[in-house]
């Protein structure tokens, strides 16, 4: 089973707030399904940060020219240091299943405060 997965954890609510994890972001994290919208990708990435699904984070945000081992170590450190508490989607522009790109404005709450961001997904 990929990192971060256990059968019992699948029954819990998804960190992104979209329902039960096994029906929400788990299929994306396991590579059984791809995100169909910018919002779904945003939610799945938030969930991956909250669950330390580093493989998924690397796969969904490639950085050519950067060493994957270094990126993996940075992500593991970041995930281990941050306690994510919740996600609020503020606005979605485009990013539907037929769109080439979309933007998602969100707030990701963590123990140290709130990350407010508008991300472009292509």
Give the location of each predicted region.
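N-terminal short leaders/motifs
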Residues: 40, 44-49, 73-81
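Surface-exposed, charged secondary-structure patches
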Residues: 78-114
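Short beta-strand edge/turn micro-motifs at domain boundaries
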Residues: 2, 116-122
